[in-house]
């Protein structure tokens, strides 16, 4: 039986495990908003390892995502509509190894393995750095280089729609601030052409970065993802979501996303989608 047959047969299991969070050491349980200017009070129950915040463009999805990230990491910045609010009245309950803990902007220590990830921004930084330093001086002196394993290559090919003979990753450090970033070299099947990150289209480059990030993320992490649909066609979005479900299940991740794409939302249950809207002068959030 091929890897593709096995993976496709188990996709329903991955999504079920995302929904029921069986054997997860970390479970985000609830989000509470009380007495916060500009916001209606809300008590939101979170029942899935994958939660998406949706709403129209410009409504503040990113601000809310960054605020939740900031409360858990204690790195609160660029929170937009919340910047002048009393954010200490926003609390998040998480079960960690069977024990419930409450986090606010001032309560609880910053958690390990909490990351905010925006593939589009990372892709832009990488391309800008390539344009600034086309010879890539010092990039590969201490970089970690490897080829993606077949089990990951299956998903890469399905998501990008390309048949790669191999995907080589160089994890580059010490070039862009404290950011570790991937530099790719790929070869397509039945082709003599080898090309690298700077020769890729925006969609292909962003997808490879997003896939790399999920492979690179440690087990039992909490990952915040900013609009994964940007520059990506609907079919790739759907296949990316299947890979995300596979990764959440195998690594026991908690993932929160901001999105306005129906293709990103469609495989998720209604109880895993939070709707951000504006009612009069106040914002509302509901599921």
Question: Which role fits each region the language model picked out?
Answer:
Residues 2-17, 125-202:
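Extended helical coiled-coil dimerization/tether regions that scaffold
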Residues 15-65:
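Pre-Walker A-like glycine/lysine-rich segment at the N-terminus of P-loop NTPase domains
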Residues 47-81, 206-213:
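Phosphate-binding glycine-rich loops of NTP-binding sites
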Residues 75-162:
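Nucleotide-state sensing region of NTPase/ATPase domains
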Residues 200-225, 234, 238:
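GG-anchored amphipathic helix commonly corresponding to the ABC/SMC/Rad50 NBD signature/C-loop
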Residues 239-244:
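Conserved hydrophobic alpha-helix in the ABC-type ATPase nucleotide-binding domain
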Residues 258-260:
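H-loop/switch region of ABC-family ATPase nucleotide-binding domains
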Residues 265-287:
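RecA-like P-loop NTPase motor core
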